[in-house]
Amino acid sequence: MKFSEGRAGCKEDIAAARADGGSFRPSAVIQLARALFKVSSFYMPNLDDGPRPSLAGSLLVAHPNMLDPNFRRAVLFISAHDPKDGALGVIINRPLDRQVADLVTETPPANLAEVPVFLGGPVGKNQLMFAAFEWQKSKGLKLNHNVGLAEANDAVDQKSPATICAFVGYAGWGAGQLEAEMKQKAWLLQKPSPSVLELDRLPKLWFDIMRSLGPWYKMLAAAPDDPSLN
């Protein structure tokens, strides 16, 4: 299966994904989640002056002081971001220790039965969507979400270089909400490396990122959830 290259974000598609009272529409997300980006070091865009940059294609890393259980020690891929309309993304470091065959009511295609499932976020948890990650030396990491079982099955069947996984739920922000949270230092931004494709490393991804940011973040990351245990 050939994965087409799409846009990093589009306000019409974000609006479509939030239509019908905020219910999840995978057909809209598939238009949003196609992004190409190259690896680089930790960065923080200037959200105070000038046009606000799109954060699509970035890893959104929860600050160690983040206490919201939905995002505590979470790493998300931002698949779409428009400052006027909001953002969409999925958590990539929370495997459910389940496979597709464990969650679907009908027998899935054989190639997908053992595909690992991740908790993608607190919204739309009754939906299962597939994603294909592919690292390209010249372009960086490419992510495609596929709606149907057949499309994802074809990608596996054709021995695509892409890594296939599935997500339950996603994360969403309204216009200006993510920017406000970033100004409050709730999130750190980082661009990913090929290690994102190593699924067995993803559960430790947040800790790995904290260690890479230096002694201060490493110390904060090591603090227990219960302050009385310090």
Task: Identify the role of each PLM range.
Residues 3, 13-14, 30:
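Short terminal hydrophobic/aromatic SLiMs and anchors at protein ends
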Residues 37, 42-230:
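A short aromatic-anchored loop/beta-hairpin motif
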Residues 4, 23, 27, 40-41:
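Serine residues within intrinsically disordered or low-complexity segments
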